[in-house]
Amino acid sequence: MVNRNPKRSDEPVWWGLFGAGGTWFAMLTPVTILVLGILVPLGVIGPESMNYLRVAGFVTSIIGALFVIGSISMPMWHAMHRLHHGMHDLKFHTGTAGKIACYAAAALATVLSVVFIFMI
């Protein structure tokens, strides 16, 4: 028989954030590391393009703020989802408390990144 009142799961929400975070981490984080961690220190990109006023101007624009918030929060959602399911795979059955702790840490990182961006 078909269950007419199936129990709803919140897992699609977490899988969506997991997928978005993984995509962000795979596509945008390497480029960010290349530019900020390799090309600027080697002088390929001039230091005048990364002075405080230009970087602060970028971060305070809407696209820059969204980029910084995404760079902090999206990989965090990915990592916390992976940690939650990794604990389950390793037979650390923390139940709802572990789930809440993992996703609360990701939510806290997201909220703090938004707060700190608006403080600039």
UniProtKB/Swiss-Prot annotation:
It is found in: Cell inner membrane. Belongs to the FrdD family. Gene3D superfamilies: Fumarate reductase/succinate dehydrogenase, transmembrane subunit. Disulfide bonds: none annotated. This is Fumarate reductase subunit D. The chain crosses the membrane at residues 25-45, 55-75, 100-120. GO terms for molecular function: succinate dehydrogenase activity. It comes from Aliivibrio fischeri (strain MJ11) (Vibrio fischeri).
